[in-house]
Curated annotation (Swiss-Prot):
<comment type="function">
    <text>RNaseP catalyzes the removal of the 5'-leader sequence from pre-tRNA to produce the mature 5'-terminus. It can also cleave other RNA substrates such as 4.5S RNA. The protein component plays an auxiliary but essential role in vivo by binding to the 5'-leader sequence and broadening the substrate specificity of the ribozyme.</text>
</comment>
<keyword id="KW-0378">Hydrolase</keyword>
<dbReference type="InterPro" id="IPR014721">
    <property type="entry name" value="Ribsml_uS5_D2-typ_fold_subgr"/>
</dbReference>
<dbReference type="Pfam" id="PF00825">
    <property type="entry name" value="Ribonuclease_P"/>
</dbReference>
<comment type="similarity">
    <text>Belongs to the RnpA family.</text>
</comment>
<dbReference type="GO" id="GO:0004526">
    <property type="term" value="F:ribonuclease P activity"/>
</dbReference>
<keyword id="KW-0255">Endonuclease</keyword>
<dbReference type="GO" id="GO:0030677">
    <property type="term" value="C:ribonuclease P complex"/>
</dbReference>
<keyword id="KW-0540">Nuclease</keyword>
<dbReference type="InterPro" id="IPR020539">
    <property type="entry name" value="RNase_P_CS"/>
</dbReference>
<dbReference type="InterPro" id="IPR020568">
    <property type="entry name" value="Ribosomal_Su5_D2-typ_SF"/>
</dbReference>
<keyword id="KW-0819">tRNA processing</keyword>
<dbReference type="GO" id="GO:0000049">
    <property type="term" value="F:tRNA binding"/>
</dbReference>
<dbReference type="InterPro" id="IPR000100">
    <property type="entry name" value="RNase_P"/>
</dbReference>
<dbReference type="GO" id="GO:0001682">
    <property type="term" value="P:tRNA 5'-leader removal"/>
</dbReference>
<dbReference type="GO" id="GO:0042781">
    <property type="term" value="F:3'-tRNA processing endoribonuclease activity"/>
</dbReference>
<protein>
    <recommendedName>
        <fullName>Ribonuclease P protein component</fullName>
        <ecNumber>3.1.26.5</ecNumber>
    </recommendedName>
</protein>
Amino acid sequence: MPTQHTFSRELRLLTPEHFKRVFAEPVRAASPQITLLACPNTLEHPRLGLAVPKKALKRAVWRNRVKRVVRESFRLNQANLPAIDIVVIAKAGVKEMDNEELFKLLEKLWRTLSRRCNG
């Protein structure tokens, strides 16, 4: 996998089976606003799936903002992550955070998840 910072199709979880595998036996990293679930994959790179429920974030603009920030954070940190499938679940509290706070929280959670999956 090239070290360029892109977010192409092969870096995403696309099918329900991919998501089910992660939900079956996950390694967790969580905060009150966001939960990250992960499980090892057989590829050479990490993949990302997003779960931003309407129940937690009622307005589409709120959901889209969270997804945009999560994708950007993943794109910039993917080189530091092991070969794992990750599902990011947003909770209601994430709406109160600004983009910078959310970005810092995600970086901390990526590091935690990476440590737990490697060791």
